[in-house]
Regions:
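ABC-type nucleotide-binding domain
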Residues: 1-205
Length: 205
């Protein structure tokens, strides 16, 4: 069993196929558990409306998607109803995920299209840059619970260190659940869970 309290930062470690991504999909109710139960605030997860449940989480999946929109719209898409949202919010989100250099190199700044489409002069981000854009979108959503599946898998070690330190500061008091196979990401967590064959093998701080 595993207990996660409000404000915890949980790192789920394990080799490929150990069940890390499955834990995330169960929390988001992509499917339900066959045995046992998942409780949120002492209430069975199956009793929550799926849409309302998912609205609580800000999520970046391992197979994240960026859109053929401008950089601004790629970040803002998670916060479309916020009339007070400004470009500064996008710039702040990019800074938190150590992506200032992406913005600096874009020919039209936030108005630059991500991916080249039709007759527009877009920008083709690298794998690490794509991951940072997806992370910036999640940060912009500002949910109380953030779930990240292998959030730095495509990012170089130096940038990973900056990103993780920024996230640690930004997410203070919020709940963070993230998976990783890199030990370098462990310092972001205050609790570490080791999975093996879908079972909690070890747990500690």
């Amino acid at each position: 069993s595993l207990e996660i309290k409000q404000g915890d930062r949980i790192c789920i470690l394990g080799v490929n196929g150990s069940g890390k991504s499955t834990v995330i999909k169960l929390l988001l109710r992509f499917y339900d558990v066959d045995e046992g139960e998942i409780l949120i605030n002492s209430k069975n997860i199956k009793e929550y409306d799926v849409c309302n449940l998912r609205s609580v989480f800000s999520v970046v999946f391992q197979d994240y998607i960026n859109y053929s929109f401008t950089l601004r719209d790629n970040i803002k898409i998670t916060d479309l109803e916020n009339a007070e949202w400004t470009d500064e919010d996008a710039i702040k989100a990019l800074h938190i995920v150590d992506a200032d250099n992406i913005l600096k190199k874009l020919p039209e700044g936030l108005d630059t299209y991500i991916q080249k489409i039709f007759d527009r002069n877009g920008y083709e981000p690298s794998g690490g840059e794509q991951q940072k854009i997806a992370l910036a979108r999640a940060v912009n959503r500002r949910c109380k619970v953030m779930i990240l599946d292998e959030p730095t898998a495509a990012i170089d070690p130096e940038s990973e260190c900056n990103l993780l330190n920024n996230l640690k500061h930004e997410l203070y008091g919020k709940t963070l659940i993230f998976t990783s196979h890199r030990l370098s990401a462990v310092h972001l967590a205050d609790k570490i869970v080791l999975l093996e064959n879908g079972q909690v093998k070890e747990e500690g701080s």
